[in-house]
Regions:
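N-terminal cap/lid segment of alpha/beta-hydrolase-fold proteins
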Residues: 47-98
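Alpha/beta-hydrolase active-site loop
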Residues: 154-192
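Short beta-strand element of the alpha/beta-hydrolase
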Residues: 100-110
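Primarily recognizes the serine-hydrolase "nucleophile elbow" in alpha/beta-hydrolase
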Residues: 178, 182-266
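C-terminal catalytic histidine-bearing segment of alpha/beta-hydrolase fold enzymes
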Residues: 296-299, 303-349
Length: 349
C-alpha cells in the first residue's frame, strides 16, 4: 500500500506534542514513504489543504450513530440460510473545527467473538481526538456468531489448515476485515458531509481491533473486497465499493498478524511492502492473549520494508493495558503525537 510523502521520524511540522514525549518517540525508525494512491487525490488534497488540529481540547464533541452498510449473517459457516444485518458506527464530530479535518477509525477488540464500538476506552480515544479537531468513527463489525459470508478459498483453507476448535474464530477474520474496509469507504463516501481530508485517515484498535487496523494499513485494495461477488452476497452493494479504503497511519495496541498470514498462505505473496502505512506498535511483553512475538514480527516486517514505525514494549505488562503510560505519556498522547509527526499536521494553539 502507498502513503503520502511523509518521512518516518520526519523532523518537520509543529513540535509541541513531541516535546512532551520526545523520549517516547525516540524509538521511531523507518525511511521516507513514497507518494501515490491508486484511488487518486481527494478534493481536499487537490486544494492543497493540510489539516489544522489543536494542542488542547477545544471543540465540543457531537456524537451520532449511523449504518455504514449491511452484511450477511449465515446460519452456518460457508452456507445455510442468510439474513442481512446493519453494520453500525458511532460518529464523533468536532463542532466548529475548520474544514479539511483528519479522521480516526477506531476498532474494538474481543477476540472476534465479542466486544462493542461503545467500549469505554475507545470512547475516551474518540473524545480525546475529536476535541482536538479529528472526526472519529468507532465501528462494529460481524463476529463469530454472525457467520459472515466467506470466499470458497477461505472455507477450504480453514478445513485443511485450522483445527476444528479454532475454525470459528479463524473464519470470523474475513468478514470482520471486509466490514472494517467498508467502514473506511463510508468515510470516503461522506467526506464532503463531514468536511474531511481523506488523505489523513488513521486506523487504531485494541487486540482484535488492531488486527483489523493493521489489515487497513498493509493489505492491497482488492483484499477483503473482491473475493466475494455481489451474486454471492447482495449486501455488498451497500458498502460503497467504488470508494477506496486507504489509511495513512496505524496505531496498534497488542494486535496480531493472522489475516496477513492467511493471505500469504492462499496466494504465496506477502502483503508487506514499502508503501504500507507507518505504524506505532504498543504491546505488553507479558501478554498471554496475543503474544509479544506478534509485535516483534510486525516490527521485523517494517524493518525489512523500511517503512516508518515506533516500537513501544510495555515491560512485564499483560493484555489490554489501556491505562499504561510510555515515558509519562498516556496512550492517547502517544498516539496523537505519532499521527501528528507522521502526517506533518499543522498544530494550532
Amino acid at each position: 500500500m502507498t502513503a503520502p510523502g511523509w518521512s518516518g521520524c520526519a523532523r518537520r511540522g509543529r513540535r509541541w506534542w513531541l516535546a512532551a514525549v520526545v523520549a517516547v518517540l525516540a524509538g521511531c525508525d523507518g525511511a521516507e514513504v513514497p507518494a501515490g494512491d491508486d484511488a487518486g487525490p481527494s478534493d481536499a488534497d487537490a486544494a492543497g489543504a493540510v489539516p489544522v488540529v489543536r494542542r488542547t481540547a477545544t471543540y465540543p464533541v457531537l456524537s451520532s450513530t449511523h449504518v455504514y452498510g449491511q452484511g450477511l449473517r449465515h446460519s452456518a459457516w460457508g452456507g445455510g440460510t442468510t439474513s442481512p444485518i446493519d453494520l453500525q458506527l458511532d460518529l464523533f464530530e468536532p463542532q466548529g473545527a475548520p474544514a479539511g479535518r483528519p479522521a480516526l477509525v477506531i476498532i474494538h477488540g474481543g477476540g472476534f467473538s465479542g466486544g462493542s464500538r461503545t467500549q469505554a476506552e475507545l470512547r475516551s480515544f474518540a473524545e480525546y481526538f475529536t476535541a482536538r479537531g479529528w472526526v472519529c468513527i468507532s465501528i462494529d463489525y460481524r463476529l463469530t456468531g454472525d457467520r459472515g459470508t466467506l470466499p470458497a478459498r477461505w472455507v477450504q483453507y480453514l478445513e485443511d489448515q485450522v483445527p476444528p476448535s479454532s475454525q470459528g474464530q479463524a473464519a470470523a477474520l474475513y468478514p470482520a476485515a471486509r466490514d472494517a474496509k467498508a467502514a473506511v469507504r463510508w468515510l470516503y463516501a461522506n467526506a464532503s458531509t463531514y468536511q474531511l481530508n481523506t488523505d489523513y485517515v488513521t486506523a487504531m484498535g485494541g487486540s482484535a481491533g488492531s488486527y483489523l487496523a493493521i489489515v487497513l494499513g498493509v493489505t492491497d485494495p482488492q483484499d477483503f473486497r473482491d473475493e466475494v461477488s455481489a451474486s454471492e452476497d447482495p449486501t455488498l452493494a451497500s458498502t460503497h465499493l467504488d470508494q477506496p479504503a486507504r489509511v495513512r497511519t496505524v496505531i496498534d495496541h497488542w494486535g496480531g498478524l493472522e489475516h496477513l498470514r492467511i493471505l500469504e498462505a492462499l496466494d504465496g505473496r506477502s502483503r508487506f511492502d514499502d508503501g504500507d502505512a507507518p505504524v506505532s506498535i504498543v504491546h505488553g511483553t507479558a501478554d498471554a492473549t496475543v503474544p509479544f512475538t506478534e509485535a516483534e514480527a510486525l516490527r521485523a516486517a517494517y524493518v525489512a520494508t523500511g517503512v516508518a514505525y515506533a516500537f513501544h514494549p510495555l515491560e512485564g505488562v499483560g493484555h489490554g493495558a489501556w491505562t499504561a503510560t510510555v515515558g509519562g505519556a498516556t496512550l492517547e498522547e502517544l498516539a496523537i503525537a505519532f499521527v501528528i509527526e507522521q502526517q506533518a499536521l499543522v498544530v494550532s494553539e
